[in-house]
Amino acid sequence: MGLACLASLVSYAAEPIKVACIGNSVTAGYLLKDPEWESYPSVLQRLLGPNYEVGNFGHSGATLLFKGHRPYVQMPEFKKALDWDADIFVIHLGLNDTDPRNWPNYASEFKRDYNALIDSLTHKNPMKRVIIAQMSPITASHSRFRTGTLQYFDEIQAEIKRIADARNLELINLSDPLYNYAHLLPDALHPTSEGAIRMARYVYGSLTGDWGGLSMSPYYGDGMVLQRGKKIRISGQADGGARVTVHVDKDREYLAMSNHLGKWSMLIDSLSTERSHSITIMSKGQRLQYNNVLAGDVWLASGQSNMAWKLNQTKDQRREAYRDDDRLRAYVMQPIAETNKTAWPEDILTQVNNHQYYKKTSWQTAQHLENTGQWSAVAYHFGRALRDSLPDVPIAIVCNPIGGAPIESFVSQRTLEHNLPDMLTKWYDKPYSMPWVRERAKENIALRPQGQRHPYEPGYLYAEGIEPLHGLGFKGILWYQGESNADNPSLYKQLFPLLVDDFRQTLGKNLPIYTVQLPGISSRPEWSEFRLLQEDLTSIEEGGKNAQKNIFLVPTYDCADSLDVHPRYKYAVGNRLARLVLQKTYHREQAYGQTKLGDISLVRHGKKYYLISDGTFIKQNQALVKGDIQGFEFAHADGVYFPVSLEQDKKGRLFVSRAIGDGLVSYRYAYPAYTKANLYNQYGIPVLPAFGRIDYK
């Protein structure tokens, strides 16, 4: 029985419609002070009103498996549910089947037992409406999470879906309202009163089809930019089973139907980049209209504070920074509170817990000083340079960096559960994140230290800032982050590939990712090795060691401030990103060049040794630097490095005197945390920090 039949029952039934909630301790309301008032079935009753009667038939510890340690079909609640003869059944079982006494022994019987349970409940009337629920979450703090529970949980979730599909039953997933809210599951299993309310609202929507009507992602708005050059996916929310109509420019119409969860999605034809468009979305008398919509290339700019640094905070604002350009646009996601050294007030803490850390925002054009001054300086200069080189292509930047954020906050909870689950529990007190990150988070949540979320929490910013962008369409990603992870490069080496996979799965398969190498600062000696790690994490075809493709790196050590982690000069960073993008993504020649040094050979010529890499002379860009070349360190067999100033001949070729060049075995370039290295390629891009062997030819 679907939504149409339900509407008929509501209209004509003399008796209330009976809804039986079948389940375990989560349904029963275990740990709640007043289950008769706070459990999700009790909340559901209040939401549904007098036309319904909701029965709570949950039994703590119950298993779906008939041979489990506490089979639901042997519990008194099962007999009561049979006798009650409900019109609708909502079944939520399986959590206790993850127990090692159950799933490893009887997994093959789960499907049979689930079908038998459904048949028993509906034997008087096989047409009764049955909704089966995939399980509410088990969090990483569960005592058996790492010893089988997560694997069993995933297998049971998949089996429940197969059962629903085979019987053509309505399927809901009670992980959806709770998954990114671990603080609402204090014992890893059972929801708090607030968690039960979230569950009840979700089940209410599934029962009635009332999902609040037509709504769209906040990304949709006047002035938005959609990715050009391909069909565009438009997705949104409506009431369950509703017809949705989309009009594009009044001459194209597209239709979709929402599913029982109110979700709908459609593909529309690609849009012209030459003019603006209007998109109108309608459903059940509701109407949303978006004007001045462009098709262009959409880039995500993310990371931490050096990406977040605003244009009006920099020292290299140029007059073109405020040049009017309606076809350069940004969707700037800014936090409701900066992670400064302060205790956040209660209202901020509540919003953070509710995943409302980003302010409401709207699309902006580069036409007003007050707009562009608030943009990320790096992102603005990147977009400005692309617009100058691609005048026929609108460029849009979606900006969501957060100052101080560690990389793990941008990795999904799901990915961390399956790879680094220990990071998800008591993260404030574990050394995965650098001490500054953990201490700053504790300062921010000092007024509510228990059960409080923070944007630095592993997985938080993925759920808050990345996942909501799913399906929107992007050209590529700019990533400037690492300051908060540089003290643990071995962990970053594990996390960065996970982030790449998450971003690409969410935002677009094989999207190019352009990373910014950390600049330099005297007080952070660990940055030397971290910068080299960042090079290793680029793609193999770029000279790195990462098998993931399309990952590129821009050096910035020459833009550094020896005393400030936030260099105030951002023009070069954004411009270099744009030039690298023009070369790699847009295949423009003579934009960026080669910046990677490999092993070096020394070729003797009289009293000099010339430096050769990859078969060619290493040359300086004489238009930028005419004197000695700084930044090289050499070592003999003892492995002790010493700095050397290299000279250049009239052709810019680098050489060193024979007295210095004899007996060398290795070199480093631009290695110190703060360096004045000054070797540039022919396009004015600094050569990346490097180390390698030296041989003689």
Across the structure, where does each feature detected by a protein language model lie?
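Low-complexity, Pro/Ser/Thr- and charge-rich linker/hinge segments at domain boundaries
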Residues: 217, 227, 290-312, 319-323, ...
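C-terminal beta-sandwich/jelly-roll accessory domains of carbohydrate-active enzymes
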Residues: 614-697
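Short, conserved helix/loop micro-motifs enriched in His/Cys and acidic residues
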Residues: 331, 336-373, 475, 479-484
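Extended acidic/polar, glycine-enriched regions
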Residues: 235-314
